[in-house]
Amino acid sequence: MFTDTINKCAANAARIARLSANNPLGFWVSSAMAGAYVGLGIILIFTLGNLLDPSVRPLVMGATFGIALTLVIIAGSELFTGHTMFLTLGVKAGAISHGQMWAILPQTWLGNLVGSVFVALLYSWGGGSLLPVDTSLVHTVALAKTSAPAMALFFKGALCNWLVCLAIWMAIRTEGAAKFIAIWWCLLAFIASGYEHSVANMTLFALSWFGHHNEAFTLSGIGHNLLWVTLGNTLSGAVFMGLGYWYATPKAERPQPAAHTASETTR
C-alpha cells in the first residue's frame, strides 16, 4: 500500500547522503535555498496579515503560505523538516546509516538558517516596510513565540511538521494539480492553527531582529523557541511520519534493507 512511496523516500534519502558527501558546497547551497524559499513565504503572509482584521488574518495567511513548500518541492531544495521523514525512512530501508542521518540533519538545519537570514537581510536592505514600527505583526508575533512555554512550542512543533510532512508525502503520491492542492490544504491548516515551524521561525525572528523590535525580544528567547520547535518538528517527521508509515506497511511489503553498506550510498 505504501511501498512505492517508501521506496521513493528512501531513494531520496540516498540522494541526500550522496550530495552531502560528494558535493558539500552544493548541499549547503541547496539547504540555504530551502530556508530562503520558506522565508519568501513568511514575508508574503506577514505583509498580507499586517493589513488584515485579526478575525480573518489566520485564514488569509494560511491560504497564501503554500508558496513556501511549493517552491521547496517544485524548484528543489533541502528542507530540514522534510529531511526528518526522508532520512528516517532511508535508515529503515537500509539506504543510509544512522550516522549519516544524524550528520546530515544539523547541516540541513544550519543551511536553512543561512538562507532564512539572507532573505531577511535582503528585505531589510530593501526598505522592509514591516520592520520600522514595533507594533507591526512581525514584531508582535516574534515576541510571543520567543516567550511561549517550552512544552507548548514542542507540541505545536510536532503538529506543524506532521502537516508539512503529510504535504510532502501526499505530493509524492499524487500527480499534476493534486500536488499543489495537497500542499495548499496542509499549509493552510498549519498556519491557521498557529503551529510552529523551525525554518519559518528563522526568517520571522531575523526580520524582527533587523527591525525596530521590542527590548524583550532577545537572542536567548530565539534560542528557546528554535530548540523546542526543532525537537517537536523532529518528533513528528521521524516518528509520526517516518516510523508511522514504515510500520503501517505490512512487513512482507516493506523494502528490504539493501545489501550494500552505508558507505556505498555516498559513492
Where in this protein do the model-derived segments appear?
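Alpha-helical transmembrane segments and their helix-helix packing motifs
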Residues: 1-267
